[in-house]
């Protein structure tokens, strides 16, 4: 399965993605996002960690306003 980076405050999303069989990495800094197929961020400060500018190979999903299920669906559609 995919390697998904998830911002540390999104524990419900981390658990849901792990249950789907994904490898979940907690993102605490820009460096943590490297090597991830996809990253999920809170969007509270849209580029606080510089993730939007990093050269990760996958998508960056803004979780703001989305349910856990909606986030998981977006992850599945982008990997």
Curated annotation (Swiss-Prot):
InterPro entries for this protein: UPF0180
Family from the record: Belongs to the UPF0180 family.
Taxonomic superkingdom: Bacteria
HAMAP family attached to this UniProt entry: UPF0180
Protein name: UPF0180 protein BCAH187_A1552
NCBIfam families assigned: PRK03094.1 (NF002845)
